[in-house]
């Protein structure tokens, strides 16, 4: 069990100015007036994930989305190493993705950074050590991030990934197990909403 309060975490994205907390439960994204916005964890988003990889069954979001300009830097929240990285090419998938591994008092924790730029993975390598606050990636554009508006999908996992992928949305029938396996990213990001 992780004692989250014993650890100090660096910001993952420097959100400049005010931001909007999105309500994506209606299944569509409406552009906010702020430069940055946040999509919620444990949010049902029926109708939003309509590409073949979701099969209409998966629409419970188990990460946090931080939306902002293309090229926005993404930083490591604590000391760790790169566990996996790669490109998921299917429409609606992550596009470029990096997964980092961290030790929190003897418990392994993985963090997925999804919807990244091509540049983010060009010189990446598994086992690369990362420091708190180190820029490890950048928000990707539509053509490289799975076809989404520019944002970071940030997700924690207590389950070791076998590749550069984790389910960012699950079936509502899997909610109980998914929330155990993929803890609330606000434990690291702080109270975004």
Task: Cite the ranges covered by each PLM segment.
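Terminal peptide-recognition signature
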Residues: 66, 80, 100, 133, ...
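Short, glycine/small-residue-enriched coil/turn segments at secondary-structure junctions
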Residues: 56-90
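Histidine-centered active-site/metal-ligand motif
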Residues: 61, 102, 115, 151-153
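Zn2+-dependent peptidoglycan hydrolase active-site motif and core
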Residues: 76-120
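Short alpha-helix capping/helix-loop boundary micro-motifs
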Residues: 67-69, 119-124
């Amino acid at each position: 069990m992780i004692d989250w309060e014993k650890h100090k975490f660096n910001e993952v994205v420097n959100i400049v100015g005010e931001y909007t907390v999105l309500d994506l439960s209606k299944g569509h994204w409406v552009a906010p007036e702020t430069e940055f916005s946040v999509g919620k964890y444990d949010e049902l988003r029926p109708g939003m994930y309509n590409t073949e990889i979701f099969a209409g069954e998966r629409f419970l979001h188990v990460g946090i989305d931080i939306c902002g300009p293309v090229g926005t830097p993404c930083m490591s929240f604590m000391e760790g190493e790169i566990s996996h990285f790669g490109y998921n090419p299917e429409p609606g998938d992550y596009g470029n993705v990096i997964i980092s591994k961290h030790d929190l008092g003897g418990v392994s924790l993985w963090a997925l950074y999804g919807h990244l730029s091509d540049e983010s993975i060009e010189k990446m390598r598994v086992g690369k050590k990362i420091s708190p606050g180190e820029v490890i990636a950048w928000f990707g554009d539509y053509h490289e991030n799975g076809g989404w508006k520019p944002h970071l999908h940030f997700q924690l996992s207590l389950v070791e990934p076998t590749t550069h992928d984790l389910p960012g949305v699950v079936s509502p029938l899997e909610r109980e197990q998914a929330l155990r396996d993929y803890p609330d990213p606000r434990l690291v990001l702080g109270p975004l909403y």
